[in-house]
């Protein structure tokens, strides 16, 4: 069997993504019922972190342990990834020691080079370009609360960042409508828009957050300046009209969900009233990172 990498939603088939989501639901239910299975007994996951992390580190570590495997954490400063040793050599060496590699990095190119040279599965834990694991958790969370996402409308307001890039890919893979409102100069990368449209994504772009959110089934945002992207920082006055507050949520459907990958800058991209309110499912999202990633791990390792 060829090596199964999980680099982006665009690189995995719709059928495999749906298989993983269904598997995540089953694994979550079994855990809640007290069932314990260890399909990854004896397997080791190397976790490489160029960027600090809470959810990614803990969810992959706990997830691997719940599946019976083990983890080893490596930081960019410890490894000097791509500096004292080439990424290609690192990939080849780690492939001799471990069964899979997860990387959270500021550089998507590092992920791709690692994938090209590793002989074990490589998982994208987050890059400056995409965040596919987050979208797996988001779709799982939406469907837990509202049923199949196909045909529904999801709205994004804020910065055109890595989460939005994966959301664009998800819109094509999972067949939902995506409305996007970003300020001028903060647009998502054109390559992700083009890929989504070429694969059936139904996209609508606007400068108006109210227009984007109108009758949406779910409203999604993220921090205005992503970690490691401070050089892209723009004045809050540029983004302030895109804040998700009660007034903006009123334009969505009455039962609309609110999502945020966390950590949230309360009072900036979202108000306390919304993130702590009845629309919010942000902590369900965070929990589902664990279960969605367990399904990704099992798929990558053929378990």
Swiss-Prot record:
Which cellular component terms (GO) are annotated to the entry?
cytoplasm
Q: Which GO terms describe its molecular function?
A: amino acid binding; ornithine carbamoyltransferase activity
Q: What is its main location?
A: cytoplasm
UniProtKB keywords: Amino-acid biosynthesis, Arginine biosynthesis, Cytoplasm, Transferase
Q: Where does L-ornithine bind?
A: 162, 222, 226-227
Question: Per the record, what are the reactions this protein catalyses?
Answer: carbamoyl phosphate + L-ornithine = L-citrulline + phosphate + H(+)
- InterPro entries reported for this sequence: Asp/Orn_carbamoyltranf_P-bd (IPR006132), Asp/Orn_carbamoylTrfase (IPR006130), Asp/Orn_carbamoylTrfase_sf (IPR036901), Asp_carbamoyltransf_Asp/Orn-bd (IPR006131), Orn/put_carbamltrans (IPR002292), OTCase_ArgI (IPR024904)
Question: Known EC number(s)?
Answer: 2.1.3.3
Question: Which GO biological-process labels does this protein carry?
Answer: arginine biosynthetic process via ornithine; citrulline biosynthetic process; L-arginine biosynthetic process
According to its UniProt record, this protein's enzyme class is transferase
Entry's localization field = Cytoplasm
The source's superkingdom equals Bacteria
Q: In which pathway does it act?
A: Amino-acid biosynthesis; L-arginine biosynthesis; L-arginine from L-ornithine and carbamoyl phosphate: step 1/3
Name the residues that bind carbamoyl phosphate. 53-56, 80, 104, 131-134, 261-262, 289
Describe the task this protein carries out.
Reversibly catalyzes the transfer of the carbamoyl group from carbamoyl phosphate (CP) to the N(epsilon) atom of ornithine (ORN) to produce L-citrulline.
Similarity comment: Belongs to the aspartate/ornithine carbamoyltransferase superfamily. OTCase family.
Protein name according to UniProt: Ornithine carbamoyltransferase
What is the name of the gene encoding this protein?
argF
